């Protein structure tokens, strides 16, 4: 009987600890603005900011340009995203974690919270479907009352 109880407790601890809790956050106020891309060359300027970063290349293999999906979201919620060419992005510390472009990277106080991985099958529909992208990003950032 003790072994069964111990097994159940262990199982509950393992499964309970594996679930990653998502904590929503606000972007810095200045990004709740017009819904435009802001080109940036030096991410060091944003050390402690909380923002959305779009890293891109000049070619796209998706049927629908993912930039259109992102723009739909930006216009709907009037949220500005920073944009940086992937060649410049490779020179940043974020490149250690994000290896492919295009990508949307959610940054909180200068640290990556999560990102879309162009090399991951689970993220592909988020690049092509505005609703799926919106569902994903709204799990992380507050948008209540913005649309």
Give the role of each language-model region.
Residues 106-147:
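Non-catalytic, surface beta->alpha helical segment in thiol-disulfide oxidoreductase systems
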Residues 26-42:
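Post-signal peptide N-terminal segment of mature Sec-exported envelope proteins
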Residues 39-76:
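Local sequence-structure signature of Cys/Sec-based thiol-disulfide redox active-site neighborhoods
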Residues 95-108:
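Structural micro-motif
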Residues 57, 78-91:
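Thiol-based oxidoreductase modules, predominantly thioredoxin-like and allied folds used
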Residues 13-16:
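C-terminal motif of bacterial Sec signal peptides marking the signal peptidase cleavage site
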Residues 18-20:
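Bacterial signal peptide processing site
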């Amino acid at each position: 009987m003790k072994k069964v109880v111990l097994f159940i407790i262990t199982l509950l601890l393992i499964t309970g600890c594996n679930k990653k809790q998502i904590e929503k956050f606000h972007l810095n106020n200045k990004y709740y603005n017009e819904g435009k891309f802001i080109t940036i060359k030096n991410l060091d300027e944003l050390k402690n900011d909380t923002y959305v970063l779009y890293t891109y290349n000049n070619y796209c293999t998706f049927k629908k340009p993912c930039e259109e999906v992102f723009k739909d979201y930006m216009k709907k919620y009037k949220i500005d995203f920073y944009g940086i060419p992937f060649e410049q992005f490779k020179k940043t510390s974020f490149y250690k974690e994000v290896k492919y472009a295009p990508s949307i990277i959610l940054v909180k106080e200068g640290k990556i919270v999560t990102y879309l991985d162009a090399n991951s099958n689970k993220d592909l529909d988020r690049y092509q479907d505005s609703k799926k992208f919106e569902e994903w990003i709204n799990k992380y950032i507050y948008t209540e009352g913005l649309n």
